[in-house]
Amino acid sequence: MAKGLLVTYALWAVGGPAGLHHLYLGRDSHALLWMLTLGGGGLGWLWEFWKLPSFVAQANRAQGQRQSPRGVTPPLSPIRFAAQVIVGIYFGLVALISLSSMVNFYIVALPLAVGLGVLLVAAVGNQTSDFKNTLGSAFLTSPIFYGRPIAILPISVAASITAQRHRRYKALVASEPLSVRLYRLGLAYLAFTGPLAYSALCNTAATLSYVAETFGSFLNWFSFFPLLGRLMEFVLLLPYRIWRLLMGETGFNSSCFQEWAKLYEFVHSFQDEKRQLAYQVLGLSEGATNEEIHRSYQELVKVWHPDHNLDQTEEAQRHFLEIQAAYEVLSQPRKPWGSRR
């Protein structure tokens, strides 16, 4: 039966973040992706408003086809590639939170989770990719970064590149009953959310410990991009701040939010270390005045400006960027620990 555009828009408006419109159009992989990410964080759901006519046309065209295109490679899509990397990282973080206590986690569970996230995006719409090669790429990349939470990023990138290289159109299959499709989606949803819910409810301390370690690694990457670092810090600590605003000091007797307090202290200590590093870059002792910071910055910028060091351009460029980042860190007014909360 042909799919209707008005029905699709109605389902998009009513249950878009849960993927109801994709379920109606037979795009089960897309529906599962939206279920697990709440419509791509809401942004993907809104962006689809202009894409729904093409989705409906694609679904109706697939019903009239007797065989899938053979020997034809789908066009390369930068948006799909970026989504594969992001969802791979997302699946990896969920695995890090919920499955990190497993033996050989970094060898088995982490690359498997990241690879499945990449494959889920690869299977959106009428396309798919090679299952074995994509997972194989994830498993081969994982040992290189063994034991490091930041391994999620290179594993996701490697798996996404492999998935793009082996992209192809899906083979046409007979339509299945809705009950079978819902059963399959339900199992996949439970497999994703079950370990996460168990870890969050029964192992809060260990969960937040791994979250802190992971975000510490990411904050290290952003140490010379203070604006991005502060944004990451704000997102990480948002649940803590909201709970404190609503409940006050009395709401922190539970072990869960005592662990959030420890996590807050971790990020705070990380910012202290970043300021100490900035003092070292500018050649100052901790507690230097704003005038001393500004004077040292101006002197070092003149010394290490790339235009003044043509014989060692790369080294000068590196020092120049470090000096600018350190000055930006120290230029921000530092709030006392109590007021930051």
Curated annotation (Swiss-Prot):
* Membrane-traversing stretches: 5-25, 30-50, 81-101, 105-125, 138-158, 185-205, 218-238
> By what name is this protein known?
DnaJ homolog subfamily C member 22
**Which compartments is it annotated to reside in?**
Membrane
Q: Which GO terms describe its cellular component?
A: membrane
What the protein does? May function as a co-chaperone.
UniProtKB keywords:
Chaperone, Membrane, Transmembrane, Transmembrane helix
Q: Ranges for the J domain?
A: 277-341
Q: Which gene encodes it?
A: DNAJC22
Which organism does this sequence originate in?
Answer: Homo sapiens (Human)
